[in-house]
Amino acid sequence: MTQKVVVIYSGGMDSFTVLNKALQQGHDVYALSFDYGQRHVKELKVAAQVCKQLNVPHKIVDISAINQIIGGSSLTDDIDVPEGHYEEDSMKSTIVPNRNMILLSLAVGYAVSLKASQVYYGAHSGDHAIYPDCRPEFVQKMDDVCRIANYDAVEIFSPYLNNTKIDILTDGIAMGLDYSQTWTCYNGREKACGKCGACQERLEAFEVNNLTDPLEYE
């Protein structure tokens, strides 16, 4: 049975895979992206191009005003993006306080207005140690809340919650996906840096899968 679902779609490889998984499952997909003032805003351009190509309804919502009260992240503030492997100590500076709770809340509101039954988002196990709002206990409790917060229950669904980025890429390749249509780098430059934690984790996923990353790097 076809269901309406909202997919939180950043333009990165995880949410790109989630978007395509929802489509291949036959759902009526509505993609939702957020401009929260991230320096890697190029991901939104990539997301728009993909949705146009797939003929998926897509909204980009500007919520950058939240930075008037939320700060301290290297993704939004004038703080250097850490280089090196994707590890807790170095990557903590990339945390945007309460980001996923904000994004999920807005996505659930959109889902209710569309009469959609689920919100898909791309949390995965590689993020558990670093980002509290990607951990299973957070996803479960958000799901519990979103089932009772409105007259119409909405399920929070994270298909790769217990999988690594390596697993996500493996699944995406099996689906025939083209990862040149994604953006991962946290630095807001024309080409991916290849040095930040996000790039390092992406490159590792391709290496383990015996594949060459189609993106150009500096």
Curated annotation (Swiss-Prot):
Residue sites binding ATP per the record: Y9, S10, G11, G12, M13, D14, S15, F16, T17, V18, L19
Pathway membership, UniProt: Purine metabolism; 7-cyano-7-deazaguanine biosynthesis
Cited InterPro entries: QueC (IPR018317), Rossmann-like_a/b/a_fold (IPR014729)
EC number per UniProt: 6.3.4.20
Binding site for Zn(2+): C185, C193, C196, C199
BP-aspect Gene Ontology terms: queuosine biosynthetic process
The reaction(s) this protein catalyses: 7-carboxy-7-deazaguanine + NH4(+) + ATP = 7-cyano-7-deazaguanine + ADP + phosphate + H2O + H(+)
Cofactor annotation comment: Binds 1 zinc ion per subunit.
Keyword set, alphabetical order: ATP-binding, Ligase, Metal-binding, Nucleotide-binding, Queuosine biosynthesis, Zinc
MF terms in GO: ATP binding; ligase activity, forming carbon-nitrogen bonds; zinc ion binding
Name of one Pfam family that matches: QueC
Function: Catalyzes the ATP-dependent conversion of 7-carboxy-7-deazaguanine (CDG) to 7-cyano-7-deazaguanine (preQ(0)).
Family affiliation: Belongs to the QueC family.
NCBIfam families recorded: 7-cyano-7-deazaguanine synthase QueC (TIGR00364)
Annotated protein name in UniProt: 7-cyano-7-deazaguanine synthase
